[in-house]
Amino acid sequence: MKKVEISYNKSSVNLVDDYKKYGYVILKNVFEDNEIRSFRNEIKKNELDLEKNVHRINNNLKDVLSYPKLSKALLNKELINTIKQLLNSTPVYFGQSSFRWNEKPSRGFHNDANNDNECPFQSEYPILRIGIYLQDHDQTSGGLKIWPKSNSVWQPGRALLKKIIKYKYSFKNLFPQQYLKNINVKTKAGDVVLWNLRTAHSGSAIRLKYFTNCSLSPQIENFISKYLNFLVKPIGTERAVIFSTFGAESHQLNNFMKYAENHEGLKIIFKNSNWNDLVINEGFSLGLKLNNKLLERFK
């Protein structure tokens, strides 16, 4: 299978088709240099504030819309319009978002379609995640690794056999060709990756110094990082990323929110988060539905 880079400077007639086929798209140049600097400075400031009291760090976490200067990253017209296209519906935001600053690498293929009990090659999944990357990863380590087309196939894991037995699905799509190839997504600062929550991915991808375009499995990357780190091409700057989840009104979104409601880490974020009137009005003007059910649930 050839390597695939699904990139767009602006919305395209092929964007939705490619998202459905490959499980992700890259939206290029969404943010200007001054916005990137502002977001990076704000993330660094808030991370340092959290670190001042290590024992309370988890108790102070909030969602991105609760930080006025960072909220602009999610309340972006081009980004929201793209999400509308991909979901073919009004996007719903329910408070699941976060930022990262120089986070310790955690590698391993997984998907985030929690509480999803449907067959991936017989149904669509109307929930996606965005990653706003605030430094270049086209030639350096630290970016996103993706399995193209993994959004529409069974993925090996501990829950797979249980699903096949329970729902009487066949093994025909279990080990397709796409499991033999993965890619390190080539993002530049200000790009946004949008991927279906069923798409298998891994964070903090490694690029080698001498084979920059070679994408390895996360297990091999962990070995190289620990024992052969001299082969790794470093990021070159502090790694800053913003993540957020959006969905369309559906039973799948309801199921996912039930999962989120019982996630200990997310409970803390929901409890601490608060959207001011300016954020609510801006979201409404962009056609974004802000669902504060989980925020109110844990107040």
Functional labels for PLM-detected ranges:
Residues 119-139, 186-189, 194, 245-248:
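Short, conserved beta-strand element in jelly-roll/cupin
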Residues 31-33, 99-101, 114, 137-139, ...:
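Short, solvent-exposed loop/turn segments at secondary-structure junctions
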Residues 115-120, 181, 228-231:
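Short, P/G- and charge-enriched loop/turn segments at secondary-structure junctions
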Residues 199-299:
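Non-heme Fe(II)/2-oxoglutarate
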Residues 1-21, 27-120:
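Non-heme Fe(II)-dependent double-stranded beta-helix
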